[in-house]
């Protein structure tokens, strides 16, 4: 069961062939965050057209509360994009591996760059910034 106020991240991936679809979803999320069925989406990061952090291909990050999980998943699936969705806890490794939900084909992440357990810096950035 998901806690309605629990923080989540979605990493929405794209490649050259589906960048325009990713851009359309990005624009929609950015324009509608904090309103309607996206009221619990609080941050949409920049589209990063290169590998960054543990992510091997371009992506952008969406921050939201658990209440928005069904809506966020529905939007990603409807656009046929690949994504990694996870709770935001103090265990960055588990968040990105054993506790993660993949939509589409999983990608090999660079786990060596994740924060040590108990020191997840993404918690302080939640709702404010991505990398």
Language-model-detected regions and their locations in the chain:
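Long, contiguous binding/interaction regions
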Residues: 1-131
């Amino acid at each position: 069961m998901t806690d309605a106020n629990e923080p989540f991240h979605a990493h929405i991936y794209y490649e050259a062939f589906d960048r325009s679809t990713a851009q359309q979803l990005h624009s929609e999320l950015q324009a509608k965050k904090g309103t309607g069925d996206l009221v619990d989406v609080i941050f949409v990061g920049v589209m990063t057209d290169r590998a960054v952090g543990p992510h091997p291909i371009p992506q952008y990050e969406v921050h939201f509360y658990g209440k928005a999980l069904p809506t966020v998943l529905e939007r990603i699936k409807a656009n046929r994009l690949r994504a990694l969705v996870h709770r935001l806890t103090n265990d960055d490794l588990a968040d990105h591996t054993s506790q993660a939900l993949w939509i589409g084909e999983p990608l090999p992440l660079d786990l060596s760059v994740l924060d040590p357990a108990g020191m997840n810096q993404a918690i302080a950035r939640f709702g404010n910034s991505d990398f």
